[in-house]
């Protein structure tokens, strides 16, 4: 390998370099001469801020001729000020002495000639020995006459120098030029502030978000081709794009395009990405900002920014205004407990007026994105403002497969990588989480020095996204056996119920706060509606770990905490939300309150009496205990499979694929209709053991 730097065609960036390859280095371990070190590229943040600010001001001045003229005028005033400043200084030559000494020299007849400077209020004297002095005297007429008389009595020749024009120059330098300079600077700062880009006095009340003029953006824009898994949302937004491109198709039929489109969905489902795609495809101006940008510490700033934003958008019509995290600006009015001012309400009121004012906005579309539509003000959601609400939910198994293919197409995938199986392994994942799975797999590929992303690394990345990286801390043999029994019980019970959800991986490797995992693979179709038997089987599977520990050791460990918490929460939902209890019947208890200040997330149990609360607790306890009894009965039938799986886990730590199928092949299947019989049998056995 030579020490010569590579040519431009040979050099590649980190993004272009294939996965698993390393940056080229010299044989002695040093970088090539053409590569700068990280230390050489470090710059001061303060210097960068000053440099960026200066560049912004320079671009603004070149764009605004009036501001450039103000800047030139200010420079001329400064130059003129320093030029005339010397002319206003008092004229003085010789040595300065007190005025009393001048009177003494005059009495001694030592002064030959004296000159009175009228504007400077100074006297210059020449003595008989050739010395030259000056002294300041009061500029009143009486003092001047007294000094002149004393000099004449001393035999000096007295002259008065008028200094014409010096008073006017002094006024110009001391008063006029500073005022003109302040006026120019004030006008310049106001001009910069109104532009909104370089900062300034008016920038508080101006729209400061991101925007671009009419056009389809740069070559790196986001389009609908970059979106997968949400075909319904894409179809709805494509209609908005078509209207902005050719409104005549809709106007000929008397159809009016929606004034506002609200994207609603959980975090990470692609709401912001959809807005970027509309901006990338529509031939319209695009303005983007966050709902929190409207709220400032200064009262009235939010409303002013709303007015400025809509004014700019109307001037550049057709235009799209996108407000991310819309709930920050559109929260319900009138319920702000402890609210110190009505700044948020002023902002919302101005937004309501702008979206449905007296003037028609034919080419203006407002898009908002939020994951909390329940706290938005109802006035925003009525037709005429946000006419259309588009729900962007987590993708189903087919949508997940499309999203994984979209991200996988940008990376080298190994032949064994099955993205359809990864889609089945990730129920409930959002688009952002799926992108993170593929990215984690790519990072693991680079870490292992490989060139392609394999199926094993994709499955490992799922575990990393769900539970975190694996921990390498040491456990005692007793602790490892407890965890093995716990996770094996989950896998065996899930396999025995035969619901179509089979265990795909069991591990005793600790991740995050979990000491082990028993992941399950769903069928090729996500279940949309859950029936009561489905939820009961979920309860049984959740409590299988606790049941296995109770059978094997006669007591529970702290490792069942998360399982008990999830099972209790599910049982309470079955009783209070789904009406699946004999004690209360088909009723819903604990509607969510509408307190906006509290986030509308607390249950309102004020109208529920203590007797009903006791019934709820009894029903929840019955569901949980019955589910554990069934889990114990299933485990007693398949206790040999539990032990075989646990011993395999102690040896290999993780079981999946063929190895897991082998240890679970002896599991006896139990049909749901036999659950009541198993429950009563286990309850009777428990009574016999207690007796």
Swiss-Prot record:
Q: Name one GO molecular function term.
A: ATP binding
**Catalytic class of the enzyme:** hydrolase
Membrane topology term reads: Multi-pass membrane protein
User: Where Zn(2+) is bound, by residue?
Assistant: 486, 490, 563
Which residues does UniProt assign to the signal peptide? none
PROSITE patterns noted in UniProt? AAA
Q: What's noted on cofactor binding?
A: Binds 1 zinc ion per subunit.
Membrane-side (Extracellular) residue stretches: 86-168
Cofactor(s) named in the record: Zn(2+)
Q: Where in the cell is it found?
A: Cell membrane
Q: Which GO terms describe its cellular component?
A: plasma membrane
Q: Where are the transmembrane segments?
A: 65-85, 169-189
Classification via InterPro entries? AAA+_ATPase (IPR003593), AAA_lid_3 (IPR041569), ATPase_AAA_core (IPR003959), ATPase_AAA_CS (IPR003960), FtsH (IPR005936), P-loop_NTPase (IPR027417), Peptidase_M41 (IPR000642), Peptidase_M41-like (IPR037219)
EC code(s) of this entry: 3.4.24.-
Which positions bind ATP? 265-272
Which coarse location class applies to the principal site listed for this UniProt protein? membrane
Any single GO BP term: protein catabolic process
The record's Pfam families line, in alphabetical order, gives: AAA, AAA_lid_3, Peptidase_M41
Summary of subunit composition and partner proteins:
Homohexamer.
Q: What HAMAP family does the annotation carry?
A: FtsH
Tell me the function of this protein: Acts as a processive, ATP-dependent zinc metallopeptidase for both cytoplasmic and membrane proteins. Plays a role in the quality control of integral membrane proteins.
This chain belongs to which protein, by name?
Answer: ATP-dependent zinc metalloprotease FtsH 2
This protein's species is: Conexibacter woesei (strain DSM 14684 / CCUG 47730 / CIP 108061 / JCM 11494 / NBRC 100937 / ID131577)
Query: Which gene codes for it?
Result: ftsH2
């Amino acid at each position: 390998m030579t020490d010569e730097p590579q040519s431009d065609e040979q050099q590649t960036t980190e993004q272009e370099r294939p996965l698993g390859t390393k940056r080229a280095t010299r044989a002695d371990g040093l970088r090539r001469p053409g590569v700068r070190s990280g230390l050489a590229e470090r710059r001061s943040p303060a210097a960068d801020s000053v440099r960026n600010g200066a560049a912004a001001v320079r671009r603004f001045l070149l764009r605004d001729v009036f501001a450039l003229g103000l800047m030139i005028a200010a420079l001329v005033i400064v130059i003129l000020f320093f030029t005339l400043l010397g002319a206003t200084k008092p004229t003085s030559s010789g040595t300065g002495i007190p005025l009393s000494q001048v009177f003494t020299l005059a009495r001694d007849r030592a002064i030959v000639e004296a000159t009175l400077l009228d504007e400077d209020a100074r006297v210059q004297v020449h003595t008989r020995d050739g010395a030259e002095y000056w002294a300041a005297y009061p500029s009143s007429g009486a003092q001047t006459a007294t000094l002149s008389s004393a000099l004449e009595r001393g035999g000096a020749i007295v002259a008065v120098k008028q200094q014409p024009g010096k008073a006017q120059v002094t006024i110009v330098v001391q008063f006029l030029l500073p005022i003109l300079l302040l006026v120019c600077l004030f006008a310049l700062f106001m001009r910069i502030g109104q532009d909104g880009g370089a900062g300034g006095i008016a920038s508080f009340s101006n729209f400061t978000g991101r925007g671009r003029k009419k056009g389809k953006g740069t070559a790196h824009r986001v389009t609908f081709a970059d979106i997968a898994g949400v075909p319904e949302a894409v179809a709805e937004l494509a209609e908005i794009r078509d209207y902005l491109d050719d409104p005549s198709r809709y106007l000929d039929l008397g159809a009016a395009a929606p004034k506002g489109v609200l994207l609603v969905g959980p975090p990470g489902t692609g709401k912001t990405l959809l807005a970027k795609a509309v901006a990338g495809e529509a031939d319209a101006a695009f303005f983007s900002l966050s709902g929190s940008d409207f709220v400032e510490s200064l009262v009235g700033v939010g409303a002013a920014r709303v007015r400025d934003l809509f004014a700019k958008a109307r001037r550049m019509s057709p235009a799209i205004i996108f407000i991310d995290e819309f709930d920050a600006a559109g929260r319900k009015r009138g319920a702000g407990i402890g609210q110190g001012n009505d700044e948020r309400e002023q902002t919302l009121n101005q937004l309501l007026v702008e979206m449905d004012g007296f003037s028609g906005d034919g080419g203006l579309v407002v898009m908002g994105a939020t994951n909390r539509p329940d706290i938005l003000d109802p006035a925003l959601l009525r037709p005429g403002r946000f006419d259309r609400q588009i729900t962007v939910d987590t993708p189903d198994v087919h949508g997940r497969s499309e999203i994984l293919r979209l991200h996988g197409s940008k990376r080298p995938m190994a032949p064994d990588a099955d993205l359809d199986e990864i889609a089945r392994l990730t129920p409930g994942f959002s688009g952002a989480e799926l992108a993170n799975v593929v990215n984690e797999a790519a990072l693991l590929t680079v870490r292992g020095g490989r060139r392609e992303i394999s199926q094993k690394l994709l499955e490992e990345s799922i575990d990393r996204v769900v539970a975190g990286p694996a921990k390498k801390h040491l456990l005692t043999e007793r602790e490892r056996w407890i965890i093995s029994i716990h996770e094996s019980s989950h896998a065996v019970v899930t396999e025995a119920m035969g619901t179509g959800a089979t265990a795909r991986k069991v591990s005793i490797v600790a991740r995050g706060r979990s000491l082990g995992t028993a992941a399950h693979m769903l069928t090729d179709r996500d279940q949309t509606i859950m029936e009561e038997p489905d939820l009961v089987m979920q309860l049984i599977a959740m409590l299988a770990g606790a049941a296995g520990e109770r059978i094997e050791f006669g007591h529970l460990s702290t490792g069942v905490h998360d399982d008990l918490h999830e099972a209790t929460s599910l049982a309470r939902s079955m009783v209070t939300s789904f009406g699946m209890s004999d004690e209360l019947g088909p009723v819903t208890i604990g509607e969510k309150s509408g307190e906006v200040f509290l986030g509308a997330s607390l249950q309102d149990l004020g109208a529920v009496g203590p007797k009903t609360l006791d019934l709820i607790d009894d029903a929840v306890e019955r569901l949980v205990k019955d589910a554990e009894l069934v889990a114990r009965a299933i485990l007693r039938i398949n206790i040999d499979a539990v032990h075989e799986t646990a011993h395999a886990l102690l040896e290999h730590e993780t079981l999946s694929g063929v190895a897991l199928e082998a240890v679970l092949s002896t599991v006896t299947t139990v049909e749901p209709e036999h659950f009541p019989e198993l429950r009563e049998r286990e309850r009777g056995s428990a009574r016999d053991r207690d007796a």
